[in-house]
Amino acid sequence: MKKLMTSVAMAAAIASPMALADTTPVMFSTLDHTNAPAGDSVGGVRLSVLHGQVAEVKGVDFSLLGMSETDRTTGVNFGLFFGGSKVNQEMKGVSLSLFNWNEGQTTGVNLGAVNVTNNVEGLNWSAVNYSQGYTMADIGLASISKKSNFQLGFFNKTEQIDGVQIGLLNCADNGFFPCFPIINFAK
């Protein structure tokens, strides 16, 4: 047993620098997975032009004239001059972009012209919010989700409202009316 524990400790000690070797503090990303310096993880600042892709960003991710794509982001996505962000698995933090496209779990705030999300524990604030899962709070001209706790806008639509909808037209499959002006809430 002692030899096994020693072997596991040695393997972990050897593997840990290799795991960190692919992380860089600063990166430039563009088309065809071109990353300078080469790597798949950023722990600092990344600038993405046109369409940059990496597995993970922990820090600030700037997108310029195109889309920044990651699997996981912890920090801030910031779209500059028609920049947007796409997170495939998990976003923790704030996305401030022309469009925010988060396919997995989001914890934080999405602020943009268009938000396309899955599950959001936080706030979606944009002209158009579209979510295939649960949203805690949506504020916008139009908000459409599968399930929501709170929606505020001109048009709000969800299959299941847990809290309240406030707007010109509010539709919820479980609402006290399927569609109702000004306010709607669960039966």
Over which residues does each language-model region extend?
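Sec-dependent signal peptide recognition
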Residues: 2-9
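N-terminal signal peptide c-region/cleavage motif recognized by signal peptidases
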Residues: 16-18
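Surface-exposed, glycine- and small/polar-enriched segments that build interaction surfaces at terminal
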Residues: 21-187
